[in-house]
């Protein structure tokens, strides 16, 4: 009964946004990590995303091993939900050891490779197929458009080939997460945005070495 009540308590805390309380409970009893791992298999995307963030926090506090964190993040990257995938990539980006061990490029390659495989045309496998733009690609194109330039929204929309609704959604996300900044209507990359762009470009250079 104690395990069941703890599971319910943790889930309720997560639903109510009380992440610090969840972290404290797990720090007091690391066996409760199993509950977080279980939630990662849930169909509730927001619950899954929050649990990814909790794992990232626990790793930074030394409560979760890098191999365990990477294992669960990679499992999420192979799913079909783009929001969960994006959050997994952003958590990976915050882990210095990932860059040192060159794991981030391998993981992103696995994700992109899955996307390509899903889009393959069985009639012509001689070249890589076109991949439908997803959230990662749209973010990449916005960051690339802003790089080394001070652009206003219309020029970014044109350079990244975005309609107004899509631009508004993504530019809001990038501003809120401090990948870009806006000053007097002009957008520029932050150091955090430059780092993300650099890592994605490294992956594309590995996939398309002749371009």
From Swiss-Prot:
The record lists the membrane-crossing segments as none
Q: Could you tell me the superkingdom of the organism this chain comes from? A: Archaea
Which Pfam families does its entry note? Answer: HTH_45 (PF14947)
Annotated Gene3D superfamilies:
Winged helix-like DNA-binding domain superfamily/Winged helix DNA-binding domain
What is the designated name of this protein?
Uncharacterized protein MJ0290
Q: Which organism is it from?
A: Methanocaldococcus jannaschii (strain ATCC 43067 / DSM 2661 / JAL-1 / JCM 10045 / NBRC 100440)
Upper classification of the source organism reads:
Archaea, Methanobacteriati, Methanobacteriota, Methanomada group, Methanococci
């Amino acid at each position: 009964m104690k395990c069941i009540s703890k599971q319910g308590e943790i889930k309720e805390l997560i639903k109510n946004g009380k992440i610090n309380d969840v972290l404290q409970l797990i720090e007091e009893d690391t066996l409760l990590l199993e509950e977080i791992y279980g939630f990662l298999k849930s169909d509730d995307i927001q619950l899954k995303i929050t649990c990814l963030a909790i794992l990232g926090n626990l790793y930074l506090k030394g409560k979760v091993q890098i191999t365990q964190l990477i294992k669960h993040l990679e499992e999420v990257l192979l799913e079909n939900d783009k929001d969960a995938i994006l959050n997994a990539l952003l958590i990976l980006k915050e882990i210095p050891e990932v860059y040192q061990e060159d794991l981030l490029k391998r993981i992103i390659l696995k994700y992109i490779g899955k996307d390509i495989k899903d889009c393959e045309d069985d009639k012509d496998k001689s070249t890589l197929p076109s991949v439908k733009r997803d959230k990662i690609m749209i973010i990449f194109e916005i960051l690339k458009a802003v790089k080394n330039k001070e652009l206003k929204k219309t020029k970014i929309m044109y350079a990244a080939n975005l309609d107004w609704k899509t631009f508004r959604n993504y530019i809001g996300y990038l501003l809120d997460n401090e990948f870009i900044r806006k000053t007097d209507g002009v957008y520029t990359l932050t150091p955090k945005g430059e780092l993300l762009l650099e890592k994605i470009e490294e992956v594309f250079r590995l996939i398309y070495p002749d371009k």
